Swiss-Prot record:
Identification of the protein by name: UPF0502 protein ESA_02280
Xref: InterPro entries: DUF480, WH-like_DNA-bd_sf, WH_DNA-bd_sf
Family from the record: Belongs to the UPF0502 family.
Species of the source: Cronobacter sakazakii (strain ATCC BAA-894) (Enterobacter sakazakii)
Protein origin, superkingdom: Bacteria
Amino acid sequence: MKHQFSALEARVIGCMLEKQVTTPEQYPLSVNGVVTACNQKTNREPVMNLSEAQVQETLDQLVKRHYLRTVSGFGNRVTKYEQRFCNSEFGDLKFSPAEVALVTTLLLRGAQTPGELRSRAARMHEFSDTAALESALETLATREDGPFVTRLPREPGKRESRYMHLFCGEPDTATLAASNETAGVDTDALTARVEALELEVAELRERLESLLGHLGE
């Protein structure tokens, strides 16, 4: 596939696509806007902490490669950027709204199951059911000008296979599996911590009620 990006380029493109749909009133984006979008703590995997210089360098590279263009003119005191990656007037890459939502979510969060994709892509496109989403994934995986996504081998103990975009090359399945396993462990630890805190709060509430009861006697 001719459309290949570095990890930072993929993050910037994903942010551009996301903001174009979800916050059109703030689009095109300034450099600061792109930095903020790239470093979001939510809906990003991995969470990044990019500097303005890193983002500016990435923007410049994408402009040179004709995946972005600068927007400046009357009323614009700062340079802003908009994507030419897909569905642009002069570009040859065309995606449906469903495909844009899936590609964007994969660019921003990496490998995911159909269930995860349906939930996380809902702000950009509402899929009627999982079958409709899987149909769109299959189209992305088999298009003549692609493939753009691939289905990863199902991991032991998992019910669903995950899908990954191919805009950064063939995925390293071993690394992705290890990352997913670590994420699962982190989630389990967080759940246990929350349950422990809830129990502690309940005990403190009982003590407080008992103390108030004694004071009222």
